[in-house]
Amino acid sequence: MEVGGDTAAPAPGGAEDLEDTQFPSEEAREGGGVHAVPPDPEDEGLEETGSKDKDQPPSPSPPPQSEALSSTSRLWSPAAPENSPTCSPESSSGGQGGDPSDEEWRSQRKHVFVLSEAGKPIYSRYGSVEALSATMGVMTALVSFVQSAGDAIRAIYAEDHKLVFLQQGPLLLVAMSRTSQSAAQLRGELLAVHAQIVSTLTRASVARIFAHKQNYDLRRLLAGSERTLDRLLDSMEQDPGALLLGAVRCVPLARPLRDALGALLRRCTAPGLALSVLAVGGRLITAAQERNVLAECRLDPADLQLLLDWVGAPAFAAGEAWAPVCLPRFNPDGFFYAYVARLDAMPVCLLLLGTQREAFHAMAACRRLVEDGMHALGAMRALGEAASFSNASSASAPAYSVQAVGAPGLRHFLYKPLDIPDHHRQLPQFTSPELEAPYSREEERQRLSDLYHRLHARLHSTSRPLRLIYHVAEKETLLAWVTSKFELYTCLSPLVTKAGAILVVTKLLRWVKKEEDRLFIRYPPKYSTPPATSTDQAAHNGLFTGL
């Protein structure tokens, strides 16, 4: 535990006035997000301080011990369904070549394994799956032994290690960690890994494959996906905001320009077009959805984050691409057809998601209209300044400096508005500044990520949820606060007192309120597309299967 311990903090003075305000809503495919699964009651390695409050948003209860977790989560990169060409040309070695006896392998803070019910290795975060086949066999034996007694194994705790299991259909996912993450947070990462696999093959294809042959080697169909999974896990550890908050991050942009870009997307329609997205560096500029296609089945932020990570990959650094995409939250058994293109040789990326296989040329025509419209608006220069194109090829492209808040002592923060109109819930969003000194080095960013995970687990504890946490660590002070209107995590200088922290947070909330039109998409645009030219397209593409 960090030096100084934790002390309960009262609600900041003047907080009620602030709460009355409305807060609307290299290669990368990392991510984004669903609400993390709430911590298990057993996860109480840290002393909890603070008090319950009726303003605390409800936290869902964990599933029963024998219940299989079936939901999927945000932060994946899609590819093609079975027997369809994949979008990414990458191939990967599947990590380091060590085994459990290798010191370098044992020194890793966290391992993730994927294997089939029959014990067939599929993926390992570190080390080759061949060298780890015996280890994965032991995992399969543990799961089978518990299942034979009519139960399901969820987690094993051993000193400072956690071993978390997740059964998803014919696949078994295991996380072994000595980080400060709770079992529930590790389970959320496993759900993200599973969703990555589903987005590549679709859930129905995976089930059909193993129903036909239980010991099938799924790596044949996932060739090249190992590095994608590696990047996914790296991004969740280094930039946990999207996963913890279940939201997407937008590029800060003046509202008139963002509205003009949204109107431009609304005017560019094609038969079967369901969703149009403008993004840069894995962050959202604006998006427009078709009224009818997504009216009853809203696009989950996890699926949107999936798309943002996907279009930010180096595979789409130039030119245009056309590929099928499975969105596991929308329909894990079906897929869309996606048109992806870089605009005017800039990092700005256009994504058009449709339901018709033969719509490539219609989508390409939309791309030309969008390019012409953006030049007419002078949007490229504004987007270049807003998104810092010098580093926009990565998903961690800087958006703005924490110095813009004008609150001395504030180092970093994560902010998600909660009290937003219903039509904004289609697009949960959060904002955070770029990480600057003293969090320039990877180990420092990792340490800050651990602190955010720890605070999140305690705020959303199922046994004793907290509303406000003031935590004094060795190198920084942190304040986490959740109300009915927002969820906030702040990192402050270690010299900031409790009273000073309250003043900094109050100033931050006022700044966010002032800048909300620039930080968030407050009015997501909608449009209607022309009728489809073929009556059998919906049945063919499987988009609405199971809805």
Swiss-Prot record:
InterPro entries for the chain: FUZ/MON1/HPS1_longin_1, FUZ/MON1/HPS1_longin_2, FUZ/MON1/HPS1_longin_3, Mon1
Organism this protein belongs to: Homo sapiens (Human)
Highest taxon of source: Eukaryota
Quaternary structure note: Interacts with CCNT2; down-regulates CCNT2-mediated activation of viral promoters during herpes simplex virus 1/HHV-1 infection. Found in a complex with RMC1, CCZ1 MON1A and MON1B.
Biased composition (Low complexity): 1-15
Name of the protein described by the UniProt record: Vacuolar fusion protein MON1 homolog B
Taxonomic classification: Eukaryota, Metazoa, Chordata, Craniata, Vertebrata
Residues with the N-acetylmethionine modification: 1
Keyword Cell cycle: no
GO BP term, pick one: late viral transcription
Any one cellular-component term (Gene Ontology): cytoplasm
Residue numbers spanned by region Disordered: 1-106
Family classification: Belongs to the MON1/SAND family.
Modified sites of kind Phosphoserine: 59, 61
Record's note on what induces expression: Induced in fibroblast KMB17 cells by HSV-1.
Keywords: Acetylation, Phosphoprotein
PANTHER family: SAND PROTEIN-RELATED, VACUOLAR FUSION PROTEIN MON1 HOMOLOG B
